Regions:
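Non-globular targeting/processing and membrane-anchoring segments
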Residues: 1-108, 128-129, 142-251
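Conserved segment of the thioredoxin-like fold in thiol-based oxidoreductases
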Residues: 111-139
């Protein structure tokens, strides 16, 4: 294997700074693309789809769990899929392993859920084996998958629910588009409301708050504003900014 040359610390830093210019350009281009997603037209969902959940039948509205946004990943775990009934699709399983702790998305009024055609008894067993108990997972009972382009291949749909419980499809990605997902930021960037931070280019009236100060450990999101957890995060953010952390490619 032919590796790049070994260089001095000064040469390495110069090469790093040169690459950083392109990385920042990519970050800004990614931000601009997310801003365009937030301005995409929305498609009304007219059909009343029914799923089976761990507690019985569930509507698409139920999958939101009372939140404003819903991300749905089509996981192939059902008859005809390699490994059935002992396991789900290896590729889908790999993606599921990347999914962020749902509490971080929930804190941004967003729910994530998986859907398959496997019965709930098999889903429960499979979740326990893989350590995915915290992920909501529903059984398909109708044509929801084919209606939303995930009948034959994995993919991620995003929906928005308004104050009257009307549902709109706001985004869809499949194939290699799913590769970039898994982390909280990546998921929020494909939603209609985005990260909901005040630096974003977002349509007027969308919810926004100062960047990063809403972040918590995943079991501390119930801490109210002004609590020790909230104040600690605000202090940490300011300390990081003062130390020049914005020099990274994420700025």
């Amino acid at each position: 294997m032919h590796m790049p040359p070994a260089v001095s610390p000064q040469e390495w830093k110069a090469a790093r700074e040169e690459l950083l210019v392109e990385e920042k350009e990519l970050t800004h281009a990614r931000d601009a693309l997310a801003a365009k997603r937030r301005r995409m037209p929305r498609m009304a969902v007219e059909k009343d789809d029914v799923f089976e959940g761990p507690n019985g039948p569930a509507s698409l509205v139920d999958l939101f769990e009372g939140r404003r946004q819903l991300i749905v990943y089509r996981f192939f775990f059902e008859p005809g899929v390699h490994g059935w009934p002992d396991g789900g699709c290896p590729g889908c399983s790999w993606i599921a392993d990347q999914i962020t702790h749902p509490a971080h998305l929930n804190a941004r009024d967003t729910t994530i859920a998986l859907i398959s055609r496997a019965p709930q008894t098999d889903i429960g067993r499979w979740k326990a084996r893989m350590g995915w108990e915290i992920l909501p997972w529903y059984t398909l009972t109708d044509d929801f998958d084919t209606d939303f382009d995930v009948g034959e291949w994995h993919g991620t749909n995003v929906f928005y629910r308004d104050d009257d419980d009307r549902i709109f499809r706001t985004y869809f990605v499949d194939g290699r588009g799913d590769e970039a997902l898994g982390g909280t930021w990546a998921y929020l960037d494909i939603t209609a409301l985005g990260r909901q931070e005040d630096w974003e280019d977002t349509p007027e009236g969308y919810p926004q708050s100062p960047a990063n100060v809403w972040l918590r450990r995943h079991d501390e999101y119930d801490a109210p504003a002004g609590s020790e957890a909230a104040e600690a995060m605000a202090v940490q953010v300011e300390r990081g900014r003062a130390a020049g952390q914005t020099k990274s490619s994420g700025s």
